[in-house]
């Protein structure tokens, strides 16, 4: 677990580290005896699951590791009978290459940065 936490720490602000214990399935990619990537599947219901905490060590990026990890999450979701799989990401083109799409009919998540935020009063 320490190796996984170390990998996730390489991506501060990009991965939700506090939710690591809540994931349903967690997958790792290895090179020899080293963990070089990880990805989690969070199942919310019989219908919906999320691909999350996807990380690949910078020395091993652009070699298909991330795609294999997402494919494994997708396989697990299918095995569990999940109907819809989503990812919250800033790398939309990566997920689009794997068959994910943005649905305009869905609600949009809106965020407000509160650190340093001052009230209008």
PLM feature spans:
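Conserved acetyl-CoA-binding loop-helix of GNAT-fold acetyltransferases
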Residues: 62-75
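Short, small/polar residue-rich loop motifs at catalytic or cofactor-binding pockets
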Residues: 21-23
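Conserved active-site alpha-helix within GNAT-family acetyltransferase domains
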Residues: 79, 83, 89-112
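Cytosolic beta-strand hydrophobic patch enriched in CBS
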Residues: 26-30, 86
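Short amphipathic alpha-helix that is part of the acyltransferase structural core
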Residues: 1-17, 30, 120-121
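Conserved beta-strand in the GNAT
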Residues: 28, 34-42, 47-55
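Active-site beta-strand termini and strand-to-loop segments that position acidic
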Residues: 30-32, 112-114
């Amino acid at each position: 677990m320490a190796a996984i936490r170390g990998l996730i720490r390489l991506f501060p602000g990009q991965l939700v580290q506090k939710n690591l214990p809540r994931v349903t399935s967690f997958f790792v990619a290895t090179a020899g005896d080293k963990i070089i990537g990880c990805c989690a599947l969070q199942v919310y219901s019989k219908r919906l699951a999320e691909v999350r905490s996807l990380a690949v060590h910078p020395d091993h990026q652009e070699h298909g590791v991330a795609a294999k990890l997402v494919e494994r999450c997708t396989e697990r979701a299918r095995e569990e009978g999940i109907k819809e799989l989503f990812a919250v990401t800033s790398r939309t083109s990566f997920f689009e290459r794997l068959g994910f799409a943005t649905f305009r009919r869905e609600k949009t998540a809106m965020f407000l940065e509160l650190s340093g935020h001052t009230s209008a009063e």
